[in-house]
């Protein structure tokens, strides 16, 4: 079995190494002549195809093919050069793939690009006071009234809630269905009337919230 990368991948590795040399010493702090904002850095990485590689251009990605070997080369060379990667977080890592697979075209157009570029921050509304890893036990309920969802319940252990503009949330919308069914994935603006945040006091600097 030949585990060596072919010429195409070695050419790509050379491209990544040259990029890392160009941005050696990059900083997000105002202490370097190579200071750059995180949003600017995110844009550069997307344009080069070093992140969001397989996300279509019409949604703010690079528009390339999925290639696990190139992804490994990028991660390896960035690590060697101590070059920061792109933004992560629950929006980019969890919501964007979900929307690409299951979202409507309107949702894809509205949410994916600003999320990829760090302009829209998301938190995750899964765990509840009585439903942690067993999400089939969740009790937050959603009822459709006059074309809008009315949601009542609590979510807990929610990180980044204080910074987030949006939350993707699991809600029981069919209360008569079996416990593993009747659950909907709903996108909720965090400035929706009725949403309240309560800080859960744990060791700093971690901040989690009850919603």
Regions found by a protein language model. Name each.
Residues 1-89, 106-117, 121:
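Amphipathic, small/basic residue-rich leader segments at the start of a protein or domain
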Residues 84-106, 132:
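N-terminal glycine-rich flavin-associated loop
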Residues 111, 138, 156, 198-199:
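Short beta-alpha junctions and helix-cap segments that line functional grooves
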Residues 130-138:
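Active-site-adjacent elements of ketosynthase-type condensing enzymes
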Residues 140-143:
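A structural signal for short hydrophobic beta-strand segments in well-ordered beta-sheet cores
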Residues 148, 152-196:
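A short core secondary-structure module
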Residues 200-211:
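Single conserved hydrophobic/aromatic residue that forms the stacking wall/gate
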């Amino acid at each position: 079995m030949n585990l060596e990368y072919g010429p195409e991948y070695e050419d790509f590795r050379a491209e990544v190494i040259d990029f890392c040399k160009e941005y050696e010493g990059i900083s997000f702090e105002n202490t370097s002549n190579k200071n750059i904002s995180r949003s600017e850095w995110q844009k550069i990485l997307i344009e080069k195809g070093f992140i969001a590689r397989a996300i279509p251009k019409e949604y703010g990605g690079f528009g390339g093919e999925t290639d696990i070997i190139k992804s490994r080369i990028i991660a390896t060379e960035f690590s060697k050069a101590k070059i920061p990667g792109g933004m992560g977080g629950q929006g980019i890592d969890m919501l964007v793939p979900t929307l690409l697979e299951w979202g409507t075209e309107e949702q894809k157009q509205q949410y994916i690009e600003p999320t990829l570029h760090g302009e829209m921050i998301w938190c995750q509304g899964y765990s509840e006071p009585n439903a942690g890893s067993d999400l089939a036990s969740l009790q937050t309920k959603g009822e459709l009234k006059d074309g809008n969802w009315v949601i009542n319940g609590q979510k807990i252990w929610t990180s980044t809630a204080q910074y987030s503009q949006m939350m993707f949330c699991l809600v029981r919308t069919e209360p008569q269905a079996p416990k593993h069914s009747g659950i909907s994935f709903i996108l909720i603006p965090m400035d929706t009337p009725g949403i309240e945040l309560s800080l859960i006091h744990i060791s700093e600097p971690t901040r989690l919230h009850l919603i």
